[in-house]
């Protein structure tokens, strides 16, 4: 029987080779999750090692399926394609949602700047306040222009 660390190491090695760790616990040892490679039969890494050592004939089906599973070639292109397919969709969704959030921020910024612009109008008749108001209006218009150009890019 393998130790807990050895079982964990075996599970990790199988997972690195493309095997799936299932949520089904082995009915024999009642400790280790079952493993499977695509459509092949499930197996327990702990019990397979016990069977190899003891050559138990009562579990021939499990022992026979293990070498077949281990000898199957691992298709790196299929795994790579599958990984690209699963990662592209969330990245695209995140990119689109972050783009929408950015557009929303720019829209709110433009609205706020336009309301500040409205607050500056009508222009004051006093000369010293007129210059300050014109400078602020110019700055607001520049910020609105910048925000709109960022939205379109």
UniProtKB/Swiss-Prot annotation:
Annotated region (Disordered), positions in chain:
72-98
Q: Which UniProt keywords apply?
A: Cytoplasm, Nucleus
Q: Does the keyword Kinase apply?
A: no
Cellular component annotations (GO), alphabetically ordered: cytosol; nucleus
Q: Which Pfam families match?
A: Auto_anti-p27
Q: Where in the cell is it found?
A: Cytoplasm; Nucleus
List the PANTHER family: PROTEIN ZNRD2, SJOEGREN SYNDROME/SCLERODERMA AUTOANTIGEN 1
Recorded protein name is Uncharacterized protein C3B8.8
Organism, as annotated: Schizosaccharomyces pombe (strain 972 / ATCC 24843) (Fission yeast)
């Amino acid at each position: 029987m393998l130790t807990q660390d050895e079982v964990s190491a075996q599970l990790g090695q199988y997972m690195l080779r493309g095997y799936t760790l299932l949520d089904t616990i082995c009915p024999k040892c009642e400790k280790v999750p079952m493993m499977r490679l695509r459509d092949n039969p499930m197996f327990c890494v702990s019990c397979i090692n016990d069977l190899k050592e003891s050559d138990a004939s009562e579990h021939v089906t499990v022992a026979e399926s293990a070498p077949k599973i281990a000898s199957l070639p691992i298709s790196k292109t299929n795994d790579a394609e599958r990984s690209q397919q699963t990662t592209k969709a969330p990245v695209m969704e995140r990119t689109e949602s972050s783009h929408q959030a950015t557009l929303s921020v720019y829209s709110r910024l433009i609205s706020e700047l336009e309301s500040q612009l409205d607050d500056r109008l009508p222009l004051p008749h006093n000369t010293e306040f007129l210059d300050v108001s014109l400078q602020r209006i110019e700055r607001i218009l520049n910020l609105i222009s910048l925000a709109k150009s960022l939205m379109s890019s």
